[in-house]
Design a protein with these regions (language model features):
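Intrinsically disordered, low-complexity segments enriched in small residues
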Residues: 1-92, 99-246
Length: 246
């Protein structure tokens, strides 16, 4: 497994960003991005919190295989209390963003509070800071991604952002990364908008370590990929019809 061993905690109300160790006991017990982030969420918020209030939290999480060559190793999960149902929202997305966060040295980002103005979080390896996003507010996710890559002068920056639906707290608003990938379930984008959080731009150059036996890992990964390719659902159904076949 490949845990970086640390998370970012961002207080949008105060504008502070802090590093803290990943709870490894929880990481072992609640395996995977969805389970681990949900554990953090239920421990930190009141079950009756208004999803669009300042007291709700929203988490971007990776899992122990994120950033590796394992199948689905590029995925990440956004977890919060969702405005669409009032239940825990776990929305998953593919692309490069999840792996980039892991390669920057982080397993998870937890946002709490609410910013008084539009902001985005910039992460470059160990350096993370909140920046003004007033110039991005009102722009589409495609415009936002292009602008952040241009300002960073780096086409490999990966961006997870909201568009106008999220800004206006539409209850089914998505979070979009890599132009066409979306955490599209349960209105996680609306929670992002309620906090005046426009985007997270991340660039990682550290790679992914901590594999105990890389050679054996690659062998098993190739074996499992073959099984998935030969399965009617994962091998043919998903590429053709998407998640509606599940």
């Amino acid at each position: 497994m490949s845990w970086a061993g640390k998370i970012l905690r961002v207080n949008l109300s105060t504008g502070t960003v802090a590093s803290e160790p990943l709870n490894m006991a929880w990481a072992r017990e609640y395996l995977g991005s969805r389970g681990l982030a949900t554990k953090y969420l239920v421990e930190e918020i009141d079950a009756k919190v208004d999803p669009l209030s300042v007291d709700n939290k929203i988490i971007w999480a990776t899992g122990p295989l994120t950033g590796t060559m394992a199948s689905t190793g590029g995925r990440y999960t956004v977890v919060t209390k969702g405005p669409l149902t009032g239940a825990i929202a776990c929305s998953n997305s593919g692309g490069y963003w999840g792996a980039e966060l892991k390669m920057a040295g982080w397993d998870m980002v937890i946002f709490e509070g609410k910013s008084p103005k539009p902001v985005y979080l910039s992460i470059t390896d160990d350096v993370a800071e909140l920046r003004d996003a007033s110039h991005l507010w009102g722009k589409s996710v495609w415009e936002t991604e292009a602008e952040l890559k241009k300002s960073a002068q780096d086409p490999l920056v990966r961006v997870s952002s909201i568009g106008l639906a999220g800004e206006n707290q539409v209850l089914f608003a998505a979070v979009v990364n890599d132009l066409h990938r979306a955490a599209g379930r349960s209105g996680v984008g609306a929670v992002m908008g309620s906090k005046n959080l426009k985007a997270i731009a991340v660039r990682g150059t550290k790679g992914v370590g901590n594999l105990v036996n890389p050679k054996e890992f690659l062998r098993v990964t190739a074996e499992k990929k073959k099984i998935l390719a030969e399965n009617g659902v994962t091998g043919a159904g998903l590429p053709t019809y998407g998640t509606q076949v599940l």
